[in-house]
Structures are given as C-alpha cells and as structure tokens.
Amino acid sequence: MTGFFVLAIYIGVFVVSFFLVTKVVHRATVRDFTSLKTVTFGDESAVRPNRWAGVISILTIFLIWGMFTGSALLPKFLHAPAPFVGTAEFTYTAEANGQRDDATVTVLVHPREQDVEAPEVAPGDGFAKNDSATIAQWRTGLIRVDSNDEITKADGAEVVAINGQPIARGETVKIDSGSVTLSDKGTPNFAPSRGWQMEPLYLPPPEEVWTRTVQVVKEGFRGFTLWEHLGYSLFRVVVGFFFGALVGIPLGYAMGLSNWFRGWFDPIVEFMRPVPPLALIPLVIIWFGIGESGKIILLFLAALWIMAIAARSGVSGVNISKVHAAYSLGASKSQIMRYVIVPNSLPEIFTGARVAMGVCWGTVVAAELVAAEQGAGMMIMVASRFQNTDIVILGIILIGIIGFGIDMLMRYAERILVPWKGKA
C-alpha cells in the first residue's frame, strides 16, 4: 500500500509540475521571431533537458524520501502517518470452568532506540488479572496474559474475546492503536499500527545518511578512507572499460566490414551478450583467482560485448551513398575507413560506451565480492551483512553520482568530438 502511494505522489508531482512550469515558461517567453521557430517532432538533436524538470525531479525524490521516513528536515504536516507510539489498551475475556472474567492489558509502545519499563497497573478483581508490557514501534509482541492469572492456560483457561469481540485461535481483532491476533497456542499477539513510514532498518531518513557520511569521511570504513574506497572502484571500472573498448571496438569494426569476421565472432558475441556478469563470477575466481586481475577481467567482459556490438552497429549504419561518393572521388580503403566509416560510426560507439560504463558501474559491486578489501561495492556488501542500511544507501548514492559525472563527461566529449551527430 505504501508503494502505491509513493508512486501516486510521484506521478502527481510530475503531472502538476509539467503543466505549471510549461504554463509559466510560456507566459514568460518573449514574443519575437525566434519564438515562432518550431521543432520537428522526432528531431532528437533539438531535444534538450528541461532544467526545471531536473531540479523538481530531484527535489521530489528527496521530498518523498523525507515524507515516508519521518525526516526532521521536513515540517511534520508533510510526514506520512507515523507508526503508533504511546500507551495502548485493550481488554481480553478469559473463560475457565464455565466462568468468564475480563482484564485490561496496557502496552507501552516506545521508540526503537529507547529502553523503557512496563507501566505499573493494579491487578484488579477476579481470576483474570490486568497486565502490562512494552513493545518497540514497528515490532509485535506476545503478551502472556495468563502469567499472573489465578487460572492459567494449564488449568484450562482460554482467551475468547478481545474488546468484547469474540476471537478464536488464528483470528485478528482490530483496535484503535493496532491489532490483536490470537496465536495457535491461544496467546494474544499485539501489533501496533505501523503507519505508512518506513522503518529505519529498511530506509533511514536523509539526515541519518548524512550523519553516517560525515562519520565515514572522518573515520573511514574498515581501515580505508572513503576516498580510497571510491578510488579503487573507479580504477577498476576505468581499467576494465578501457580494455573492453580497446578489444571490442576493433572487433566490432572487423565484424562490420568482413563476412568472415562476422560469421566467426557473431555467434560468440550474441551468445555472451545476454549472460549477466554475475554468472561469470565462479569461473573468474577459478580461472584468475581472487586477486585484482579477476575483478578487472569481470569488468572487461562486461564492457567487451557492448562495445563490439556498438562498433558493429556503427559500421552497419554508415550511409552507403557516402561510401560511393568517396570512391568516386578516388579514395582508398584506408581513406574510406578514416574519413567515412570511423566518423559516421562514432555516435553509435559513444552511445555504446555510455551503456558499457553504466553496466561496469553496476558490475563493480559484484566484482568486489571477489575477496575485495576496498571499494564502494565492498562497502555496500559488508554494510548489508550488518544491516547498516545508511552505509548501503551512501554507497549507492556515491556510485550513482560518480557514474552520472562520468556520463556527463562522455556526453561533453561526444559533443566536442562528434559535432555532426544527428545532422545529415
């Protein structure tokens, strides 16, 4: 249910911001001859990212993150319903030897980081006595209501109603602050209302992630600084991608220009392309060991097939009329390669390079499973074992930021080196 509301909020913000920003920008646009210029639908070269959309998109993600984690950075009226914290009460009816008696259970639901004592309650009259217990928020607890009763379950007593509603074993009764389920052995199990907010074990609020980030920057993680972890990951990714491109691009050119190369390597490339790098980890360990070479080879294989296919596709997409025109002007094969095939295939190669770099960043976590002592992927895997979700999120964010930065650099290089992309 929480996931549905998150998706609904995200879609709602997208739609509302689209119409509002479009309307405001349209009104603020100066009416001149330039404003009359139209862009043909399908002209990809004329499409530019809307900066307002990018800013609103990032703010929306942080807003939703804060809403559903109860972040102190947001005003409370923006928070999603929180889990119940406070004192909850319900009555139970015990039946024994044909007699019934009611008693009250008082449960103190406390924040997860606090250690509190159960409230004191008067025992009351009758064979069923009042009880008290403590339960942390987001948790459930069995309440042995017969532990202080005059007639216990061993004597034949049984809970038959909660707040006056009949209940049998395995059934649940809703109360204002949660629900009570009667276990298979007849013991009430109280579950406080969980609300819509995520438990910090699964998704900590932004300020907790920031606090842990500052701590890791100052103290490091498992004997290495944060920058050393990121540096090792970046080194592995760059080296693996470099060798993948170094082998893959010439292989792709050969497959695009030679029938023999296409027939020889096409089955291999198309067979290996859908194989996930994770599936290769056991073989990489067996063949290359658990050292640094195994991790780099795994990243090399992740990039190799993508770059080969991108180069082959780039060659296949060269307009044959350009080749004929070059031949008619007396160009040699080497000149055709240098001045026609390579320039016209570069857009596809850059696209493949961006995809391959993204795959390498996704694979670095798996590569650093191979007995790594440093790296962002190693940080994530070690933190996940100890349920340090804040470090896991920190590692994911850093990998995403670095990957995004590399992609921006590659886009910039593409604009400089391939200015003719998208032009006839």
Where are these regions (language model features)?
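Transmembrane-helix boundary motif in ABC transporter permease subunits
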Residues: V239-V269
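Loop-to-helix entry region at the N-terminal start of transmembrane alpha-helices
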Residues: T2-G12, L74, E228-V237, I286-A310, ...
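Short cytoplasmic-facing helical segments at TM-TM junctions of multi-pass membrane proteins
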Residues: P267, I306, A310-A353, A376, ...
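Generic hydrophobic transmembrane alpha-helix motif, especially the helices
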Residues: G256, F265-I306, S313-G314
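Transmembrane alpha-helices
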Residues: L301, S334-A366, D390, L394, ...
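Glycine-rich helix-loop "coupling/hinge" segments at transmembrane-helix boundaries
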Residues: I286, V315, G362-I402, V418-A424
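Periplasmic/extracellular loop-to-transmembrane helix junction in inner-membrane transport proteins
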Residues: M1-F5, S35-R48, F68-G98, T104-R144, ...
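C-terminal transmembrane helix and the adjacent membrane-cytosol boundary/short C-terminal tail
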Residues: F14-R31, S316, I393-A424
